[in-house]
């Protein structure tokens, strides 16, 4: 069973994934959307941060790549 801190860490990472997916979808619809670009860049900074590395063992660059591939296929 996961402890509450692991649950919180997982929830933080999952929310960032949802936010990144949303930003990529908005960029696909309208590439000039500055708010979506800003949101995507903020998520990428998080995925490359030390805080992200403290929350999960999933490689941030790998996650970014997979989410971009997913967005292209939609």
Model-derived segments and their meaning:
Residues 34-72:
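Short, charge-rich amphipathic interface segments used for partner binding and complex assembly
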Residues 1-34:
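N-terminal acidic leader/helix
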